[in-house]
Amino acid sequence: MPFINFNSGRVLQIWDGISGTLAHTENSTFGYFTIENGTDLQEHSHIHEQCCHVLEGELEFNINGEIQVLTKGMAAFIPSMAPHSARALTECKVLDCFTPVREDFVALEKQLS
């Protein structure tokens, strides 16, 4: 799979206020997500390393207690098991990259197909 077209994928409701399309490789998961204005993603952690690249909007991240507002062109790197949360200050479009594969997202896709 050398190319990904996020426009042709099935749009999934990932969490309340977060929807998008997913793609997986052997070792990674990629998500092109729309985050509704005001969406509050409560603090959590996971085994995955994550990079969140903001394509549109303003997204406030808290990673290990360090807070930063990300805007278009900015990204956040979240190490494995790091506690983090986010709040959409506007509607946002983001590209999230996770490694290893998000098996919970794979299961969600199977459940909804």
Model-derived regions, located:
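A short, N-terminal "cap"/entry segment at the start of jelly-roll beta-barrel domains
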Residues: 1-27, 111-113
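Conserved short histidine dyad/triad with adjacent acidic residue
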Residues: 16, 31-45
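Short strand-coil-strand connectors
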Residues: 26, 62-66, 89
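Short, conserved beta-strand element in jelly-roll/cupin
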Residues: 34-35, 46-61
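A cytosolic small-molecule/anion-sensing beta-strand core signal
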Residues: 55-56, 71-72, 90
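Short acidic-glycine-tyrosine-enriched beta hairpin
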Residues: 65-80
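Ligand-binding loop in jelly-roll beta-barrel domains
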Residues: 80-104
